A protein has these predicted regions:
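Anionic ligand-binding catalytic core segments
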Residues: 1-41, 46, 50-204
Length: 204
């Protein structure tokens, strides 16, 4: 890849070169990026995605399904992280931070919010591994927080605007400095109310 070329655009161009049309290529990149954001996968390096081919004919089938997402769901982050920490995570991926990656997503239509796991679903799934019992609540809160951020972004709100509003909420009250607290604010007032507060933040 040329050093001066955007990595996401380069990957999309590679898929197009292999016969995957531009729309399908962009939709897949948006989908993969959104899923990685939701599960806090910080290791989508260049060997962790690719193009699927027919093993007999070598004909391109399409983007390879998402695989190797092991470095996710706070896999080694044992300390409490703040909402703003999760807004600026460094990643080993097509961009160097989650914020840059998710800001490149132009459409979240491939995400059916009604089918995403609830907080209780997340805890029920991960409690099957007894070694994770100490961290279940935080894992579930983080997933819910990421889900709420995606719901807001899907309404066309820029990532930086969301980050600015969360900073404002924390500056108003230090008790808001946790993912569970931000979740409670969003869920208590509703997404529409939060979006309205974002409109107000533009004049602050």
């Amino acid at each position: 890849k040329p050093n001066n070329q955007d990595a996401c655009l380069f990957y999309k161009a590679c898929m197009e070169k292999e016969g995957i049309n531009e729309t399908k290529a962009k939709e897949f990149i948006d989908y993969q990026t959104t899923i990685d954001f939701l599960i806090t996968n910080i290791d989508r390096h260049l060997n962790n995605f690719g193009i699927l081919r027919d093993s007999n004919t070598l004909k391109t089938i399409g983007p390879a399904p998402i695989y190797d997402s092991g470095n996710s769901m706070l896999y080694k982050n044992y300390l409490e992280s703040t909402p703003l920490d999760f807004m600026s995570l460094k990643v080993n991926a097509l961009c160097k931070s989650e914020s840059l990656l998710i800001s490149k997503v132009s459409d979240f239509k491939n995400i059916d919010f009604s089918k995403l796991p609830t907080k209780e679903n997340v805890k029920d799934f991960y409690k099957k591994d007894v070694t994770l019992s100490y961290n279940l609540e935080r894992m579930a809160d983080t997933f819910e927080y990421k889900k709420n951020i995606i719901r807001i972004l899907s309404n066309g709100v820029p990532y930086k605007t969301v980050e600015s509003e969360i900073k404002h909420l924390i500056s108003k009250n230090e008790s808001n400095n946790s993912t569970s607290a931000i979740n409670q604010i969003i869920e208590k007032n509703g997404i529409e109310s939060f979006l309205h507060s974002l409109e107000g933040s533009k004049i602050r």
